[in-house]
Amino acid sequence: MIFKSLKIFPFYQIYGFRFLKGMIFKKKIHLSKLNKNHDLIHIHSLTLKSIVGKNSWAQRLLQPVVLTLSMGINASLSGNMDDLSYSIDYATVYKEVFKLVENSKFENLLDLSDKISKVVLGDKCKGNWVKVIAETPKGHLLAETGLQIIRRKDGIREIDDQFFIKNLSLYTIIGINPEERVNKQNIIIDLILFKSSINLECKDDFIINTYNIEKLLKEIVKHVEESTFKTIEALALSIARISCISHNIEKIIVKVKKSCALAFAESAGVEIVRSRSCFSSNNYIKSENSIDNEAVYISLGSNLGNRIKFILDAIEKMSIKGIKVLKTSMLYESKPMYFKDQPAFYNAVCKVQTSLHPEQLLFELQLIEKELGRVKVIDKGPRCIDLDIVFYGRKIINSESLIIPHPRVLERSFVLKPLLDISGDLVHPVTGLSIASYFEKIVDHDIKPVLPFLYKNKSIDFSFRSYKAPTYIMAILNLTPDSFFDGGIHSYDSVLIDVEKFINAGATIIDIGGQSTRPGSYIIPLEEEIFRVIPAIKYLQKTYPDILISIDTFRSEVAEQAVKAGASLVNDISGGRYDPKMFNTVARLKVPICIMHMRGNFLNMDNLTDYGTDIIEQITIELEKLLNSAEKSGIPRWNIILDPGLGFSKTLHQNIELLRRFNELKSKNCFNGLPWLLGPSRKRFTGFITGDNMPKDRIWGTVAAVVASISGGCDIIRVHDVYEMYKISKMSDAIWKEIY
């Protein structure tokens, strides 16, 4: 009989079962092998009522609970013998689960599911393996929430517990089409959250081993409704990032569907799987709704009094109020746009970081305006200072007191161009189109970039698009007995005469230096440099109070004393490398600085001329580092002039190539909008080409270099022979800029 049974039921032999009397087995079914058969008893969508945590109104009241139970069996036993004794009686399971659920209170879905699994695996139900899916369709106002767990009688945990959020229906700005950048559209989000189902020896295992779904949902809803992503991939990834980083989710599946994406499809969407390790500290990017991480752009304007002083004072006050300025644009002068009968404006934009929320930021900016004396008499009329929030990250706000993005930004060149100075690839949060595209659509750009001189309350402007500015002449006044060009023929007695000649000949700036910079020259003591230049600057300031004086020095202490004596500009041939205090000093003094490219020092610069395969690319890299360092030190971008360093750390061929390709260097994105100074005057390479050994005789080589500089887009020329070079620049401006 037993032999017959074994023959009829070879399944027993396969699984190593031994049949005894009745329904008793000496050897139990191996659970892992049982699961491979996928034989299951189901109870689908059993709706009961119970208190499971809080309902959608945050109350501990009865709410519907939908249960689906799957219990592992060996269907071959009960099927072949047609005997329920070999299976699980789902009626018994139903009764026991019903009794448990409707007569108990549960902390959360995990507590409920865990206790149901213990009932199914208990002596009455005789289960060995169970999958419990528990849902609370009324658990949240916007979505259905639920949980799936798998438990075994032997206590082994096979897979992670899975919390799920289904059919979270929200409205947000999403897409790349123009209409999608204006109108919010419906999206459906499904989430599956994985949690390691560790069998903790603790009564409150269900409390320790769960997620705060309510808190997670609240943040996701806020995040999605405030977001303005162009792709659902970006939105899905941001949801995964927030979940894993902010809520400690171990692993997540995010599904995002756009219900209106395709005319003849129910939806189009994306599904991603991410774990917490995907967002490690090395590649973690904060959520876009993290206030401290959002890029905030503030526009600044003034058209009364000392305009640049008001703008600089506003920036200083912002830093005091916790509004950290990260980057500034160039400064532009613009004609009044709305109320025409008023003075021209200075305009700029700064990128800031702040923990203030938009409404708080607006309050602080308005307070700064009040502190600086702004009184509004006429709408869009004259004002000493005007501060506006242009963008606040991706936020879109439309309240009675604040509209973000600024409603008139797209019609204002004096805001669009400064934005591009800071970030060339910036896009409008609502339309998704680039700021550059809007700027190009404006036909009449009635703005011009300016270099302001705070203590003179004046500025010089530069060419921009259709507006053409003349090339400015910086006259060299070296008060050095070891000067490489003239042996130091200038004395204090002749300073006034020489400066008067320079001014009459067309010079705009007088560059005074007390330290020779020729290769091989020695560095004089600090006291000696101060003795040479400070009295001369004071004398010139007294005699010619309106002349712009530049101090040619690489020492911060000399620069500070020179500015206090009357200098308006610092010209540092080392680009801030020789004195680590230089950039901070210039930032504090609030004056422009000319940053020159060079390598090494006066003794070894001629040996440091290896620029690899492309001198322009290498100079760009090295000069950009100096530029970034200056800006990080607090020097506004509008107070920076660049100099490629002709004759410094460059061979004859490299100097010629630099002149020939100067426009290529100037056009680099990292130097966008910055003015350039070139100093080819009487340099050794000009004399080598023309055969003039004596510096005084190198005028013809200098002439050609000046013409080349202007043709390449140079803004300021630093020269010795002012009269001749001014004439040359006038003719060059007529040819290259059509100024005549």
UniProtKB/Swiss-Prot annotation:
Pathway this chain belongs to: Cofactor biosynthesis; tetrahydrofolate biosynthesis; 2-amino-4-hydroxy-6-hydroxymethyl-7,8-dihydropteridine diphosphate from 7,8-dihydroneopterin triphosphate: step 3/4; Cofactor biosynthesis; tetrahydrofolate biosynthesis; 2-amino-4-hydroxy-6-hydroxymethyl-7,8-dihydropteridine diphosphate from 7,8-dihydroneopterin triphosphate: step 4/4; Cofactor biosynthesis; tetrahydrofolate biosynthesis; 7,8-dihydrofolate from 2-amino-4-hydroxy-6-hydroxymethyl-7,8-dihydropteridine diphosphate and 4-aminobenzoate: step 1/2
Family matches, as SMART domains: FolB
pH-linked activity: Optimum pH is 8.
Single GO BP term: folic acid biosynthetic process
Pfam families on file: FolB, HPPK, Pterin_bind
EC number: 4.1.2.25, 2.7.6.3, 2.5.1.15
Keyword terms: ATP-binding, Folate biosynthesis, Kinase, Lyase, Magnesium, Metal-binding, Multifunctional enzyme, Nucleotide-binding, Transferase
Domain of life: Eukaryota
Residue segments, region DHNA 2: 161-280
Region feature (DHPS): 473-740
Residue ranges occupied by any Pterin-binding domain in the UniProt entry: 471-730
Record carries keyword Magnesium: yes
SUPFAM superfamilies: 6-hydroxymethyl-7,8-dihydropterin pyrophosphokinase, HPPK, Dihydropteroate synthetase-like, Tetrahydrobiopterin biosynthesis enzymes-like
Entries under Gene3D superfamilies matching the protein: 3.30.1130.10, 7,8-Dihydro-6-hydroxymethylpterin-pyrophosphokinase HPPK, Dihydropteroate synthase-like
UniProt record similarity statement: In the N-terminal section; belongs to the DHNA family.
Function: Catalyzes three sequential steps of tetrahydrofolate biosynthesis.
Protein name per its UniProtKB record: Folic acid synthesis protein fol1
Taxonomic classification: Eukaryota, Fungi, Dikarya, Ascomycota, Taphrinomycotina
Gene designation per UniProt: fol1
